[in-house]
Amino acid sequence: MEFAELIKTPRVDNVVLHRPFYPAVEGTLCLTGHHLILSSRQDNTEELWLLHSNIDAIDKRFVGSLGTIIIKCKDFRIIQLDIPGMEECLNIASSIEALSTLDSITLMYPFFYRPMFEVIEDGWHSFLPEQEFELYSSATSEWRLSYVNKEFAVCPSYPPIVTVPKSIDDEALRKVATFRHGGRFPVLSYYHKKNGMVIMRSGQPLTGTNGRRCKEDEKLINATLRAGKRGYIIDTRSLNVAQQTRAKGGGFEQEAHYPQWRRIHKSIERYHILQESLIKLVEACNDQTHNMDRWLSKLEASNWLTHIKEILTTACLAAQCIDREGASILIHGTEGTDSTLQVTSLAQIILEPRSRTIRGFEALIEREWLQAGHPFQQRCAQSAYCNTKQKWEAPVFLLFLDCVWQILRQFPCSFEFNENFLIMLFEHAYASQFGTFLGNNESERCKLKLQQKTMSLWSWVNQPSELSKFTNPLFEANNLVIWPSVAPQSLPLWEGIFLRWNRSSKYLDEAYEEMVNIIEYNKELQAKVNILRRQLAELETEDGMQESP
């Protein structure tokens, strides 16, 4: 297919762009295969470049011969284009709708994008499983890398290489895979060097109504326990929901077969509930006519902050089991690709200082989301505005980033990255020139040959010139476990995501720049003080030597 076939009118003059908190801009609108571009005739610096893949929905209005297109983006932005001529407006709208809903992944922009920067580091090879394994293999000999899934035959949503107990052979793993949802047998998620406890994750056991068991599965997770120790199974579903899945062949671990494990049920909502929550929240944020009571009522009705609280509470429970009770844990929901990954990731941010650095967080995203099989292509296909909802869309990753922001806000000096880093990840998960978030799992990414045909997001982010934008000026390395508050008063709305297009950020940006300047000035003064102290010490040493006989 040629993109030209979808572009009925490639260029229109005298188009007026309207955006909140910006003056209207008149210019030329151009459509390419992947971008909507508006360039001002008066000022060449005034430009809009918008990826078609970032467009969630469009509305059309007509007043006489003037047409208006309202574009609603996946990053929650809303922009308005006034286009002279009804035919031109209809053609532009038709082209945008076609180009923003391309069926084939290989027609998306990452397959056509060519970087304008020098690639210093190939991000596709920055966080390989072998490298991650080396970080803790020196502290324990109880784990090994397994290549049982190298052809993706055992579990289509797992990577080719996984970490499992050394005492469990590959044949046993194949048997366990038939007992777990989607073949997702228990694998290592995190090793706590302080006490050797671990977090494992998996899909639900397929016990069904008959109470089916798998001795290899029991042996596998028991291999993570120390002598005389008990472990915890954290099921992210309520007991009622977990029991209902038994009728469909799913279920949970029976106490009789797992006597060394205590099962705890939490109530993190399934992914399809979350999409409706996001729609309600964004709708409330965009309505500027609310009085205070109405705003608070709509915010509460969205249940977004309730989801945040439930996820963070479960992550804190997991971290508490590991660090304070000295117990290993297994985490799963139903599929093991959504709430499971939210909890394992957040628990690591609480427990492990490395996950609070830029590269450590990138490694976490790579390991616990991309390689672990979170279906980004499905979950991020649409955002809060799309009219044609599919059952698999859900802001699971955005909820996770919101939880990270909540912890960052409570511990502003313990994270090497800033809020802009989290916002950038949200934007690229939904629309990007990079191939990192394409596909639903490693199997699909291999078939698409993303490493050969697209650029990794990490190749761009980890350039020194870009890193400075995402670095937290307040960062001071903190090697302690951090315990966030989950009290309702401690969990505000993330304005940087949900209100950034509805308010001017001018004064916030100026205040941030001033803070950075003050911190840099303090560092310069501290460096001068250190030099003067060193010189004073040298002078005192010389005086002492001269006075001695």
UniProtKB/Swiss-Prot annotation:
Residues making up the signal peptide according to the UniProt record: none
Disulfide bonds: none
Tissue note: Expressed in many tissues.
MF term (GO), any: protein phosphatase binding
Coiled coil: 508-542
Start and end residues of each GRAM domain: 4-99
Gene3D superfamilies tied to this protein: Pleckstrin-homology domain (PH domain)/Phosphotyrosine-binding domain (PTB)
GO CC annotation: cytoplasm; cytosol; endoplasmic reticulum; perinuclear region of cytoplasm; protein-containing complex; ruffle membrane
InterPro entries the record matches: Myotubularin (IPR030564), Myotubularin-like_Pase_dom (IPR010569), PH-like_dom_sf (IPR011993), Prot-tyrosine_phosphatase-like (IPR029021)
Subcellular compartments: Cytoplasm; Cell projection, Ruffle membrane; Cytoplasm, Perinuclear region; Endoplasmic reticulum
Pfam families in the cross-refs: Myotub-related, PH-GRAM_MTMR6-like
Residue stretches making up the Myotubularin phosphatase domain: 123-498
UniProt keywords, alphabetically: Acetylation, Cell membrane, Cell projection, Coiled coil, Cytoplasm, Endocytosis, Endoplasmic reticulum, Membrane, Phosphoprotein
Sites of Phosphoserine modification: S548
Keyword Manganese part of the UniProt annotation: no
Assembly: Homodimer. Heterodimer (via C-terminus) with lipid phosphatase MTMR6 (via C-terminus). Heterodimer (via coiled coil domain) with lipid phosphatase MTMR7 (via C-terminus). Heterodimer with lipid phosphatase MTMR8.
Membership in a protein family: Belongs to the protein-tyrosine phosphatase family. Non-receptor class myotubularin subfamily.
The protein's name: Myotubularin-related protein 9
